[in-house]
Amino acid sequence: MSDSKEMGKRQLRPLDEELLTSSHTRHSIKGFGFQTNSGFSSFTGCLVHSQVPLALQVLFLAVCSVLLVVILVKVYKIPSSQEENNQMNVYQELTQLKAGVDRLCRSCPWDWTHFQGSCYFFSVAQKSWNDSATACHNVGAQLVVIKSDEEQNFLQQTSKKRGYTWMGLIDMSKESTWYWVDGSPLTLSFMKYWSKGEPNNLGEEDCAEFRDDGWNDTKCTNKKFWICKKLSTSCPSK
């Protein structure tokens, strides 16, 4: 009977040692503070305590920054693209409108006035007679040359509302011999339009102007409004 017990003890000893070893291992693990379900937390803790190299952390932050910039660019690019499309549509509409306007036939440019087959430009600035003549030449016209009584009345009334205005009449070549800028002389039929006592050539007054209800001679260096004149354009009949 004692031999059986002794044999039983011998048979149980390896199992007891295994249990003791297992128990000791568990206690040892607990003693070091590890738990079977705490692996992820421990790994995260390692990252937090700077076990990841600093270069990798910087790289991670750089990648995040780049991604943020890309997202912001895409967000702001959408309204910008819509605005560009709207501007393009407006530009195309204006281009089509301009093409339609250009096809319209006008006897005179937009800022000119038509009268009896001629176009007249009434300046809003003031220049000397020579500068006024140059301004007219630059637009393919000349300082106004009066050809009829109707034209004279039209120009006199228009100038009266605006102020003293140059015409294309001078006597620079020979005193008291007045001629137009197209080379034609002043005829006797137009002498009646001089104001009373004019022209008097008071102080080298060699250029004519519209003044109030008649003509006046004055210094060519004075600054006045001016009138340009050119032939109107013939439009084809529709």
From Swiss-Prot:
Among InterPro entries, the record links this protein to: C-type_lectin-like, C-type_lectin-like/link_sf, C-type_lectin_CS, C-type_Lectin_Receptor_IMM, CD209-like_CTLD, CTDL_fold
| Membrane topology of the entry | Single-pass type II membrane protein
Molecular function terms from GO: carbohydrate binding; carbohydrate derivative binding; D-mannose binding; metal ion binding
Tissue expression remark: Predominantly expressed in dendritic cells. Detected at very low levels in lung, spleen, lymph nodes and bone marrow.
The entry annotates sugar attachment on: 130, 216
Q: Does the keyword Cell division apply?
A: no
Q: Which cysteines are joined by disulfide bonds?
A: 108-119, 136-228, 207-220
Q: Which residues lie on this side of the membrane: Extracellular?
A: 73-238
Residues binding Ca(2+): 198, 200, 202, 205, 216-217
Induction entry: Down-regulated upon activation of dendritic cells.
Q: Where in the cell is it found?
A: Membrane
Cytoplasmic-side segments? 1-51
Q: Which protein is depicted? A: CD209 antigen-like protein A
